[in-house]
Amino acid sequence: LPLRF
């Protein structure tokens, strides 16, 4: 999962 979008 990415930490930021």
From Swiss-Prot:
Disulfide bonds: none annotated. It is found in: Secreted. The keyword Endoplasmic reticulum does not apply. Keywords: Amidation, Neuropeptide, Secreted. One of its GO terms (biological process) is neuropeptide signaling pathway. The modification Phenylalanine amide is found at F5. GO terms for cellular component: extracellular region. May function as a neurotransmitter or modulator. Belongs to the FARP (FMRFamide related peptide) family. This is FMRFamide-like neuropeptide. It comes from Gallus gallus. The lineage of its organism: Eukaryota, Metazoa, Chordata, Craniata, Vertebrata.
